[in-house]
Amino acid sequence: MSDDASRLPDYLGHVQQAIERIARYTSGMDEAAFRRNTLVQDAVIRNFEVIGEACRNILRDEPDFAARHPELPLSGAYEMRNALAHGYFKVDMGVVWTTIVNDLPSLLSAMRAVAVAIGSGLKS
């Protein structure tokens, strides 16, 4: 890392905020409603891109932290970001929905726990 102060709390906060936005945008929806609403799809994809970019920054700038926290799917989040950002109209919304339902709640919990552990001041 450079001589600048650690950006880790910022990156963790970006992930948390993006997950919370996705949850808000999809609240009350089932998969069929999500598939019909391209506006929500676009907003969700944008926030997945934020998650992936923040995870890439953690991997790049804080490799020791990343190594100490294998429970955080940092590489997977970045890979998903790349698939979404470069997939254009080939994105599988079923995979996106499954990720929202099955993976984001546990990722949010893990990010909050890590943030509390490092004292970043994020909401727990």
Spans of model-derived segments:
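Solvent-exposed interaction patches of small proteins and small membrane subunits
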Residues: 1-124
